[in-house]
Curated annotation (Swiss-Prot):
Its cofactor is heme b. PROSITE patterns: CYTB_CTER (PS51003), CYTB_NTER (PS51002). Heme b b562 binds at residues 84, 183. The cytochrome bc1 complex contains 11 subunits: 3 respiratory subunits (MT-CYB, CYC1 and UQCRFS1), 2 core proteins (UQCRC1 and UQCRC2) and 6 low-molecular weight proteins (UQCRH/QCR6, UQCRB/QCR7, UQCRQ/QCR8, UQCR10/QCR9, UQCR11/QCR10 and a cleavage product of UQCRFS1). This cytochrome bc1 complex then forms a dimer. GO terms for cellular component: mitochondrial inner membrane; respiratory chain complex III. The keyword Transmembrane applies. This is Cytochrome b. The gene is MT-CYB. Heme 1 (or BL or b562) is low-potential and absorbs at about 562 nm, and heme 2 (or BH or b566) is high-potential and absorbs at about 566 nm. It comes from Anthropoides virgo. GO terms for molecular function: metal ion binding; ubiquinol-cytochrome-c reductase activity. It is a multi-pass membrane protein. It is found in: Mitochondrion inner membrane. It comes from the Eukaryota.
Length: 380
């Protein structure tokens, strides 16, 4: 009998072991769909990004016009641009839900998979930031100025660091050129990191909603979860297309419609919605260095999740106290996102400071204490 090519061919064998014959826990819920949705987001962003890059000119005098030209004169250029801009929003929606799932179900106990995931998040944030600068609108220019300026808070080498990043004494042509280079390069880095992320995941196998070893009850990935993933793709691509076709500027900032003008400061400077929670944490501390450290800590704190797990149970499925904390944290992040979009005045300042304090308190103090308390309660 001839050998099955799918199982014997060196390349097809890898695909088979990752996507077809992969043993998967039978009880994973729709929360496990977001990994594959992130894969689709990445593929969509790279495809639309390549098509946009073909018509883009990384020069301060031409960047804005080249984007306008793409939207007006290139076949379906408007659609490609709208899909790319709104695809970024969907990318972040999926990654935040994916991280939330990981925190709720204790997936962070697969330390290597979790750590590569956090590195992926940081890379994605960097990619989105440099990408936002490329259309060279007002908010692109001033956003780049404000955020790169944060590096000047680094003691001793800060100012040198900023000028090195800018390629001059202000955000100008060299900055735009290098940001375009980075925006082109980073998605391919994300692809590489994704493969590492999956390699680590397939070493241990997927977690499941009960958080128990499921080796005795696994089913092949195909056709069960491949079909479930395709349903997920359709359910995500439908709202993405709806947003891109009917309301493409809903999530954008109207301040980015005028071309960049270094002589006119916009009335407010704020990032895209997916960075607002971190921006609110940055603004809540009146000291520049303190704000930058809090901003960095707001994301880097995820690296500590495995160390702060004190419960004997892996998931929060049967831990009502931890569940209450988790949903409080979720509400807290939504409050931070809202505060980040508001002007720096009373009462938003104090709300932002309280929400920032709550964010760190829940993650660093209350989660471990609650885990230990629930262990005690199990003994009674």
């Amino acid at each position: 009998m001839a050998p099955n090519l799918r199982k014997s061919h060196p390349l097809l064998k890898m695909v088979n072991n990752s996507l077809i014959d992969l043993p998967t826990p039978s009880n994973i819920s729709a929360w496990w769909n977001f990994g594959s949705l992130l894969g689709i987001c990445l593929a969509t962003q790279i495809l639309t990004g390549l098509l946009l890059a073909a018509h883009y000119t990384a020069d301060t005098t031409l960047a804005f016009s080249s984007v306008a030209h793409t939207c007006r004169n290139v076949q379906h250029g408007w659609l490609i641009r709208n899909l790319h801009a709104n695809g970024a929003s969907f990318f972040f929606i999926c990654i935040y839900l994916h991280i939330g799932r990981g925190l709720y179900y204790g997936s962070y106990l697969y330390k290597e998979t979790w750590n590569t995931g956090v590195i992926l998040l940081l890379t994605l944030m960097a990619t989105a930031f440099v990408g936002y600068v490329l259309p060279w609108g007002q908010m692109s220019f001033w956003g780049a100025t404000v955020i790169t300026n944060l590096f000047s808070a680094v003691p001793y080498i800060g100012q040198t660091l900023v000028e090195w990043a800018w390629g001059g004494f202000s955000v100008d042509n060299p900055t735009l050129t290098r940001f375009f280079t980075l925006h082109f390069l980073l998605p391919f880095m994300i692809m590489g990191l994704t493969l590492i992320h999956l390699t680590f995941l397939h070493e241990s196998g997927s977690n499941n909603p009960l958080g128990i070893v499921s080796n005795c009850d696994k089913i092949p990935f195909h056709p069960y979860f491949s079909l479930k993933d395709i349903l997920g793709f359709m359910l995500m691509l439908l709202p993405l297309m709806t947003l891109a076709l009917f309301s493409p500027n809903l999530l954008g900032d109207p301040e980015n419609f005028p071309p960049a003008n270094p002589l006119v400061t916009p009335p407010y400077i704020k990032p895209e919605w997916y960075f607002l929670f971190a921006y609110a944490i940055l603004r809540s501390i009146p000291n520049k260095l303190g704000g930058v450290l809090a901003l960095a800590a707001s994301v880097l704190i995820l690296f500590l999740a495995p160390l702060l797990h004190k419960s004997k149970q892996r998931t929060m499925t049967f831990r009502p106290l931890s569940q209450l904390l988790f949903w409080t944290l979720t509400a807290n992040l939504l409050i931070l996102t809202w505060v980040g979009s508001q002007p720096v005045e009373h009462p938003f300042m104090i709300i932002g400071q309280l929400a920032s304090l709550t964010y760190f308190t829940i993650l660093l103090v209350l989660f471990p204490i609650t885990g230990a308390l629930e262990n005690k309660m199990l003994n009674y």
